[in-house]
Regions:
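Cytosolic-facing regulatory segments adjacent to core modules
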Residues: 99-112, 116-159
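Beta-strand-loop-alpha "switch" segments that mediate conformational coupling across diverse proteins
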Residues: 210-254
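Conserved lysine of the Walker
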Residues: 43
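Inter-motif core of Ras-like GTPase G domains
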Residues: 146, 162-182
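Extreme N-terminal, non-catalytic leader segments
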Residues: 1-38
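NTP-binding/hydrolysis catalytic cores, primarily Walker-type P-loop NTPases
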Residues: 245-274
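Phosphate-binding loop that captures ATP/GTP phosphates
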Residues: 57-115
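Hydrophobic positions on the alpha1 helix immediately C-terminal to the Walker A/P-loop
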Residues: 46, 50
Length: 274
């Protein structure tokens, strides 16, 4: 395990000599990716698998599960594989979400030293902590950017009510706009995209993705409705089973998952240049 920055959240548990890497070994600046889209399109699965892929490449990555209605930490990873659980709410309810406060509240993965997570704990909700505003959300994302070279924000679908997810779309360097291949997905975007009018959203630069794509679904019609698709992430039975069992950080081994994994790798290469 190593540190990209002196203020990195990835710290050694005991004092050992840290190898000196050349400047070219790591990104010149942190890159923040927001993953957003319609309900059921595979946002959390995609965000988690991207984080897992980066960590498997020994890239230090922080993933933030922004959903304030459905805490996701216990839905993506067995509690036994996580070190001491902390809550994102403890950070956002502070007067200032400072780097030391963030570092003290990250959740570490026992099996992967290049991965940390943030999110609400099981049974918590938006009202479990004092309310926070846009300024706090912006300061939080800025400080996470200073601590980790790769940051993934798993946004909720309900950006009109979720301040952190909405601010994530504004502050991210790249946004994956995902949609399920059905009328509900198309209707969702038709309803929500007008909220993203304005230069601060950069919605014209979103990477458009069809997620959780079933073989029988008419992706051509969806592509036309969305103005084109950059990626088509297929449904994978193995991924679904991992999601149902709350173990999305488990490696994919089934032959049928190869196309899914290929899409994850291609997205990681485009977004993070790894």
């Amino acid at each position: 395990m190593f540190n990209f920055k002196k203020t990195s959240i990835f710290q050694h548990k005991e004092e050992i000599e840290v190898p000196q890497y050349s400047f070219e070994d790591f990104p010149r600046e942190s890159h923040v990716l927001a993953v957003w889209g319609s309900p059921g399109c595979g946002k959390t699965v995609t965000a988690t698998k991207l984080a897992q892929y980066l960590a498997s490449r020994k890239k230090d990555v922080a993933i933030i599960y922004c959903d304030m209605m459905t805490p996701m930490l216990h839905c993506v990873c067995p509690p036994s594989e996580l070190e001491e659980l902390h809550s994102l709410g403890s950070i956002l309810s502070a007067a200032h979400p400072s780097p030391p406060l963030i570092k003290a509240n990250v959740v570490c993965h026992r099996r992967n030293s290049h991965l940390v997570m943030l999110g609400l704990k099981k049974s918590e909700n938006l009202y479990s902590y004092p309310a926070f505003d846009e300024q706090i959300a912006e300061e939080f994302i800025d400080n996470v950017r200073e601590l980790a070279p790769y940051v993934i924000l798993d946004c909720s679908s309900y950006i009109a009510f979720d301040i952190l997810s909405a601010v994530s779309l504004m502050k991210a360097d790249t946004v994956l706009r995902m949609v399920s291949c059905d009328l509900k997905g198309v209707s969702y975007l038709a309803s929500q995209l007008p909220l993203l009018n304005g230069e601060q959203w950069n919605s014209d630069k979103h990477i458009r993705i069809a997620g959780n794509l079933q073989k029988y679904q008419a992706v051509d019609n969806l592509a036309q409705a969305m103005g084109g698709l950059s990626y088509q992430i297929p449904h994978a039975e193995e991924v679904e089973q991992q999601f149902l069992s709350g173990n999305l950080y488990k490696d994919l081994t089934a032959k049928q998952s190869r196309v899914f994994q290929k899409m994850i790798i291609q997205i990681a290469e485009e977004v993070f240049d790894v």
